[in-house]
Amino acid sequence: MPSFDVVCEANMIEVKNAIEQSNKEISTRFDFKGSDARVEQKERELTAFADDEFKLGQVKDVLVSKMAKRNVDVRFLDYGKIEKIGGDKVKQVVTVKKGVSGDLAKKIVKLVKDSKIKVQASIQGDAVRVTGTKRDDLQSVIAMLRKDVTDTPLDFNNFRD
């Protein structure tokens, strides 16, 4: 029976490349001369450092533009609060989302059931498995989910026939 998984996962290699490109641009830009602006990564947690809130906004803009160039959806980023760290310096923690949250998984299952397409959706950990008898039904579910779920980037993988 054909099936596929609905997941929400960023390509961490591309995220790392975007951070390296951002740091390179920040180190060469004239408006960051002499400042301690940078972006650091620890697993799925990015930390943006800058001299003040305005420069922190500039650092985030550079990071977002580099991620967009590397085809990493910026909806994966979850911005934390801006914290002061001694003097005028500030930092902000940015978390890269992973997995389909419980609320989103329930929403996806409800959308699939309400669509009246002959498929079954089940929550399996941080993914949603959609199973049906026809491949065409699965393709119509993918099209429907891409249209209806716009607040979170969804990937479809693990296709089985």
Swiss-Prot record:
An annotated GO cellular component: cytosol
InterPro entries linked to this entry: DUF520, UPF0234-like_C, YajQ-like_sf
GO molecular function terms listed in the Swiss-Prot or TrEMBL record: nucleotide binding
Entry-linked Gene3D superfamilies: 3.30.70.860
Pfam families: DUF520
Alphabetically ordered keywords of this record: Nucleotide-binding
UniProt key word Nucleotide-binding: yes
PANTHER family in the cross-refs: UPF0234 PROTEIN YAJQ (PTHR30476:SF0)
NCBIfam families xref list: PRK05412.1
Role of this protein: Nucleotide-binding protein.
Family under the similarity heading: Belongs to the YajQ family.
Name the record gives this protein: Nucleotide-binding protein Bphy_0527
Taxonomic path: Bacteria, Pseudomonadati, Pseudomonadota, Betaproteobacteria, Burkholderiales
